[in-house]
């Protein structure tokens, strides 16, 4: 089953009052200095994500930069990246209805397979739309951007993975 995490919010927490801890990575990929918020990423996320029995794929606007700047920082291998289409009139209509701009693309990408989407911008509108338009099981898991992925989030994702039949990612 594919697990598609976003970066900003789930891996890089933001929006809370006060300071975030600074996490040191074993190695800093070239170009990291241009992204000071990368120090908020807990390197343990890499171990925890790779321990999940699923196929990881980036579902982020970081696109290829996620593999270049984030994956090495948290010891992840190069992952597939969901390619986002150019904005369209449909996206504008969806936004007016409260549907996240990633939702349609992720459902198309999943191609009827079960999938997990981890993001800080998921709403009930997205869940309702996916339930109506995706025949496979889907967990749309909202992460509090102020905290990023927590133990509770990993438990929820692990539970879903244990109770969903495995499939092959594209």
Placement of each model-derived feature along the sequence:
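C-terminal cap/substrate-recognition subdomain and adjoining C-terminal extension
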Residues: 66-170
């Amino acid at each position: 089953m594919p697990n598609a995490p976003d970066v900003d919010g789930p891996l890089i927490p933001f929006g809370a009052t006060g300071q975030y801890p600074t996490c040191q990575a074993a190695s800093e990929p070239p170009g990291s200095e241009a992204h000071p918020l990368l120090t908020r990423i807990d390197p343990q996320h890499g171990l925890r994500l790779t321990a999940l029995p699923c196929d990881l794929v980036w579902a982020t606007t970081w696109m290829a930069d996620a593999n270049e700047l984030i994956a090495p920082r948290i010891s992840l291998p190069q992952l597939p990246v969901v390619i986002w289409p150019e904005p369209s009139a449909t996206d504008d209509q969806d936004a007016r209805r409260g549907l996240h701009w990633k939702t349609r693309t992720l459902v198309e990408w999943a191609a009827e397979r079960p999938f997990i989407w981890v993001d800080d911008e998921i709403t009930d509108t997205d869940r309702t739309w996916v339930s109506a338009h995706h025949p496979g099981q889907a967990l749309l898991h909202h992460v509090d951007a102020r905290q990023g992925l927590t133990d509770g989030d990993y438990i929820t994702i692990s539970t879903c993975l244990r109770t969903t039949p495995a499939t092959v990612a594209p």
